[in-house]
C-alpha cells in the first residue's frame, strides 16, 4: 500500500459511526521533515516547525511555553503521551501527532469532529505502523 493510500483510506476517511465527519487535513511525515504523503488540505510547514515538534518528542514539554506551530498556525499544547503523542488545540479544532519509529502521523480537525475522534484515527494508524516496524 502506498503512503498516500494510508492518508486517503485511514486518515481522511469517514469516522466510524459518523458518516461525513472526517479530519480536515492529514499527513505522514518522516522524522527528517520530508513529506511521505499528505491530503491536499495539509498546510505547508516550515522546517523549524517540524524541528520543534521532533524536539518535543525527545524533550517532552519543549513546546508548552511557545505552543505548537504548523503551517503558521499556533496550537496550544494539551496533554499527550510523552515521547509518543502530541496534542494541540486551537479554537474549535486541533491537531494530533503520533510518532512512530520512522514517521509522524498528523491529523488536523475542526468541529463537528471531536478531539477524541481525531486521536483515535491518528493513533490507530500510528500504532499499526509501529507494529509493522515503521
Curated annotation (Swiss-Prot):
Broad class of where this protein is predominantly found: cytoplasm
Post-translational modification: Phosphorylated by MAP kinases.
Any Pfam family hit: Profilin
Modified residues (Phosphothreonine): 114
A Gene Ontology molecular function term of the record: actin monomer binding
UniProt miscellaneous comment: The variability of the residues taking part of IgE-binding epitopes might be responsible of the difference in cross-reactivity among olive pollen cultivars, and between distantly related pollen species, leading to a variable range of allergy reactions among atopic patients.
Classification via PANTHER family: PROFILIN (PTHR11604), PROFILIN-5 (PTHR11604:SF25)
Protein known as: Profilin-2
Organism: Olea europaea (Common olive)
Amino acid at each position: 500500500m502506498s503512503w498516500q493510500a494510508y492518508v486517503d483510506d485511514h486518515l481522511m476517511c469517514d469516522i466510524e459511526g459518523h458518516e461525513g465527519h472526517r479530519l480536515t487535513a492529514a499527513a505522514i511525515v518522516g522524522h527528517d521533515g520530508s513529506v511521505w504523503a499528505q491530503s491536499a488540505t495539509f498546510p505547508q510547514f516550515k522546517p523549524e516547525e517540524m524541528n520543534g515538534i521532533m524536539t518535543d518528542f525527545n524533550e517532552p514539554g519543549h513546546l508548552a511555553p511557545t505552543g505548537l506551530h504548523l503551517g503558521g498556525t499556533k496550537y496550544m499544547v494539551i496533554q499527550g503521551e510523552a515521547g509518543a503523542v502530541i496534542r494541540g488545540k486551537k479554537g474549535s479544532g486541533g491537531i494530533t501527532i503520533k510518532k512512530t519509529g520512522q514517521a509522524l502521523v498528523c491529523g488536523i480537525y475542526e468541529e463537528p469532529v471531536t478531539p477524541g475522534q481525531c486521536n483515535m484515527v491518528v493513533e490507530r494508524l500510528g500504532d499499526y505502523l509501529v507494529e509493522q516496524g515503521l
